[in-house]
Amino acid sequence: MKKVIIRKTEEIENWKRNINNEINFIPTMGNLHNGHIKLISTAKNDNSNVNLVSIFINPLQFDNKLDLENYPKTIDNDIKISFSNGADAIFIPSNEDIYPPNNKNIKFLKAPIELSSALCGLNRIGHFDGVCTVVYRLLNLIKPKNLYLGEKDWQQLLILKNLVLKEKLNVAIKSIPTQRDFDGIPLSSRNVHLSKNERKLIRFFSSELLEAKKNFQQEKNINLNEIIKKLSAKKISIEYLEHLHPHTLQKARLEDNISLLAGAIRCGETRLIDHVFLMKRRPIIAIDGPAGSGKSTVTKLIAKKLKLLYLDTGAMYRALSWLLLKENIDYKKEKKLLNIFKDISIVFKSNTNSHQDVYVNNCCVTEEIRSQKISSIVSKISSIKEVRKFLVEEQRKIGESGGLVAEGRDIGTTVFPNAELKIFLTASIDERAKRRKSDKQSKDSQEIDLDTLKELIEKRDFEDSNREISPLIKANDAIEIISDGYTINEVVDKIIDLYNDKIPKETEIK
């Protein structure tokens, strides 16, 4: 594809007609650095879409005329960097192109107060209004498939996600982690203004945040006053330093697993921001739903794609049921049940086909626990108070450090009520019966009556939903996905998109 530079808004439509492809859009204000390069190269490697970089210094984002005049302008080098790192086209409009004089159709937007009044919004009055206005204008001109943004400007990222949702814009936001320079400070177009001594101060500020992140993993708490004291001792001018919820930007709560430690300081005439995410444990995805909804297949694929542990809690109940049958133990007798808990070992192991096998007391029972015989009793056994108590404790032990995706019927309500993402995956009884029939026929040649399967599923649903202990219900904060008419991969992609929207990419960096 021929690389092009577009300078007029009216040329955008002509260019779009000629490319016959979806667009990845990377908006910038120029003076490109390695952070921008990471955005462009990520877009290039993500898919086969056309990559469009814009270079526009938006006057509405500046509350200080001198700051606008002093903003670095390196257009020739920016063009070279963009094209050499994967841009197919560059859009370099003028102020008059973006904000035509006397054009009453331009929509000047206000950023949501709940997100824009904290952090940078405290002193940069109108800044985020300007961001919303220009991005809304650009998105409506370009109509990209994907919008690539950096997590360095986390508050801005939250505000733009809100904009896309509120204005019902058909674009997916893809974020990349904060990119840091050789000395640990976040890459910024304003770094060129720093003297050697000022850069030293920024480095100290960033290192204190990173040290706080490291300490938080051990101590699970943060002492803001101690950090402020250290920064003040270095004569660093602190604009703000806050410990907040990463999505609401309200004060962090004790129960928050992921929180945001964000600060802004001034070095001479230059104002710079940095942040880290604090985590008590790695994220957890909880997927609940009725039998035959596709939970196991979906959860396995999500675990593989996100490199998370796959915790099949249903298999644990089935494994225990299998052992009770094998040992001919009457599960209605509490004493015998308690005795078997002392000796049972349920272990998951990856096999040579990249699948997970289930072992009970060193015996592989992967296939046996999926038999109709086990299916007919597992709901009854899983409703026994002592059984649930024992296995929930085992599941929580596995999840103490997080980093897993678990599926079952009470994951989001009982086992991991503080999971970062809760999904309630379901489908119609007809759809679930068809899936079960297909699944069983692929494993054996025995003909299975569809109506019989429907009856069995309805019976299992009733038992699961009406049991006294941990019934199958949708958690209040769970997102329901009805999978009728969707492929497995479409459901998986939907859940991964929801995960990426909730979990900052930076949390994946060790």
From Swiss-Prot:
Region described as Pantoate--beta-alanine ligase: spans on this chain: 1-276
Recorded superkingdom: Bacteria
Catalytic site positions: 36 (proton donor)
Subcellular localization: Cytoplasm
Name this polypeptide is given: Bifunctional pantoate ligase/cytidylate kinase
Matches recorded under Pfam families: Cytidylate_kin (PF02224), Pantoate_ligase (PF02569)
Purpose of the protein: Catalyzes the condensation of pantoate with beta-alanine in an ATP-dependent reaction via a pantoyl-adenylate intermediate. Catalyzes the transfer of a phosphate group from ATP to either CMP or dCMP to form CDP or dCDP and ADP, respectively.
GO molecular function, one term: dCMP kinase activity
Residues annotated for beta-alanine binding in this entry: 61
Residue ranges the record marks as coiled coil: none
Positions of ATP binding: 29-36, 150-153, 187-190
Catalytic reaction list: (R)-pantoate + beta-alanine + ATP = (R)-pantothenate + AMP + diphosphate + H(+); CMP + ATP = CDP + ADP; dCMP + ATP = dCDP + ADP
